[in-house]
């Protein structure tokens, strides 16, 4: 064992060897030294544990190469670009919606330069940051007023805290959803100070259930759109229009949490059934909350639209300061909303909308192109084919609806890594590629791949299929 320890190169020798790597040589010397020291300490631990037993395992050329890979991995940014080949458009774990070029440029400009964030250029006095998006939200949704906070859970919380703190909010038992990250509507309500008053059964709720539950303690009626699951079979749900009529008759505000938030009617794509924000406002909701970074295709934000008197009260809530959005988000959101003034252009240039509405013919063409690139790149190690498949919208929207697509399937030939092994290698690639496996094949969905990513996908796969070195 002592002889093995003597074979380890000194730190300075490794640093000299790594100096030939342009990428590593650009790192701060102290950072590089710390990373090399950590690597050599790991080798010492492996010797003590009996995991390294042969002198050949400590050949200096091998050690230098392994160290270079480990140092590169240890010093690269943790927050990284990922290639999404899953076909899930609004992938909540991979960053949700991609921004349109105009929105990304607006956010970058807001970062790099001063702006009129809270400055009224007409008067030269202090202004409101919300003024940049209020008018366009009014125009797009038909609402009297609007406010934006940092996400939809915050939007729901500040609405309830403002309108119902210490009082009851009536909601159907079948709408007490979990919104992700183990956060549930009842818990959000409890934090807001509102008192939950459940009515109806999980599968059936009638208008009379709401009306019978109203008391002097009632502050509001809440409808939560169950966008991330469906109850089917023997069911009954009160429509928003019915609830709005009841609220108006009893003098109670009606709040609708739309969750994903949709400004586009996707019926032409075979995705009917999701209410739009415009419909919710038209049907009489007093306050509507929804997300900015899901089906809407913008940055993370919680958007609140509705009657002016309620929005004014919410705007004055001190929580608004804690939940306010930053200048980059505002810039990106305004740019995204401005694109919606021309619905056809919005569908073409907002990536989320473009991916959802992509035609089966266009996807089949893209799949054939990708398959051709992969046949060349993988040199017979995998059988590559284009097969029918399904994509998902994601982001808690359209849980029962698949989008028809053409998948590229990779099935291993003799000696090639299995689909599961290849998938793991792709996660360690640079950039990482996320795909699915099914029926003994690795599946790539072109729906969530940009045209300029196809060659990169082929390159990443070719590198991932190389024999692993020690």
From Swiss-Prot:
Pathway: Aminoacyl-tRNA biosynthesis; selenocysteinyl-tRNA(Sec) biosynthesis; selenocysteinyl-tRNA(Sec) from L-seryl-tRNA(Sec) (bacterial route): step 1/1. It is an enzyme of class 2 (transferase). The modification N6-(pyridoxal phosphate)lysine is found at residue 294. PANTHER family: L-SERYL-TRNA(SEC) SELENIUM TRANSFERASE. One of its GO terms (biological process) is selenocysteine incorporation. It is found in: Cytoplasm. Belongs to the SelA family. Pfam families: Se-cys_synth_N, SelA. This is L-seryl-tRNA(Sec) selenium transferase. Its EC number is 2.9.1.1. Its cofactor is pyridoxal 5'-phosphate. Keywords: Cytoplasm, Protein biosynthesis, Pyridoxal phosphate, Selenium, Transferase. The keyword Isomerase does not apply. It catalyses: L-seryl-tRNA(Sec) + selenophosphate + H(+) = L-selenocysteinyl-tRNA(Sec) + phosphate. It comes from the Bacteria. One of its GO terms (cellular component) is cytoplasm. Converts seryl-tRNA(Sec) to selenocysteinyl-tRNA(Sec) required for selenoprotein biosynthesis. One of its GO terms (molecular function) is L-seryl-tRNA(Sec) selenium transferase activity.
């Amino acid at each position: 064992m002592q002889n093995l320890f003597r074979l380890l190169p000194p730190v300075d020798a490794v640093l000299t060897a790594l100096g030939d790597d342009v990428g590593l040589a650009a790192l701060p010397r102290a950072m590089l030294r710390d990373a090399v020291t950590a690597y050599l300490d790991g080798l010492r631990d492996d010797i003590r544990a009996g995991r390294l037993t042969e002198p050949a395992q400590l050949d200096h050329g091998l050690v230098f190469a392994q160290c270079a890979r480990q140092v590169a991995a240890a010093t690269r940014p943790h927050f990284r670009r990922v290639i999404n080949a899953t076909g899930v458009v609004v992938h909540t774990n991979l960053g949700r919606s991609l921004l349109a070029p105009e929105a990304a440029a607006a956010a970058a400009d807001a970062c790099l330069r001063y702006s009129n964030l809270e400055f009224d250029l007409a008067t030269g006095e202090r202004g409101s940051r919300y003024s940049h998006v209020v008018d366009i939200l009014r125009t797009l949704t038909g609402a009297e007023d609007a406010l934006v906070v940092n996400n939809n859970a915050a939007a729901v919380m500040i609405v309830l805290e403002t309108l119902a703190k210490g009082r009851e909010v009536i909601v159907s038992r079948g709408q007490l959803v979990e919104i992700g990250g183990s956060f549930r509507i009842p818990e959000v309500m409890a934090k807001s100070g509102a008192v939950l008053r459940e009515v109806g059964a999980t599968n059936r709720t009638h208008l009379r259930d709401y009306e019978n539950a109203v008391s002097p303690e009632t502050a509001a009626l809440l409808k939560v759109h169950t966008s991330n699951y469906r109850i089917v079979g023997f069911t009954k749900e009160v429509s928003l229009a019915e609830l709005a009529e009841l609220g108006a008759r009893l003098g109670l505000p009606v709040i609708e949490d739309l969750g994903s938030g949709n400004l586009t009617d996707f019926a032409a794509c075979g995705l009917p059934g999701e209410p739009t924000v415009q419909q919710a406002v038209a049907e009489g909701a007093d306050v509507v909350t929804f997300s900015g970074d899901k089906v809407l295709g913008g940055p993370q934000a919680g958007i609140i639209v509705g009657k002016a008197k309620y929005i004014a009260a919410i705007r004055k809530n001190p929580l608004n300061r804690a939940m306010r959005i930053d200048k980059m988000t505002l810039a990106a959101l305004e740019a995204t909303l401005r694109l919606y003034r021309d619905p056809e252009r919005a569908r073409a240039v907002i990536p989320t909308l473009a991916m959802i509405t992509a035609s089966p013919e266009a996807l089949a063409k893209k799949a054939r192109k990708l398959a051709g690139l992969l046949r060349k790149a993988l040199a017979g190690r995998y059988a590559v084919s284009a097969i029918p498949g399904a994509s998902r919208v994601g982001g808690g929207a359209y849980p029962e609806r698949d989008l028809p697509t053409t998948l590229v399937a990779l099935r291993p030939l003799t000696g090639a890594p299995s689909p599961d092994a290849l998938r793991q290698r792709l996660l360690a690639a640079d950039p990482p590629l996320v795909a699915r496996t099914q029926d003994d094949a690795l599946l790539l969905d072109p729906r969530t791949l940009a045209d300029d990513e196809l060659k990169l996908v082929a390159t990443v796969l070719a590198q991932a299929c190389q024999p692993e070195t020690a």
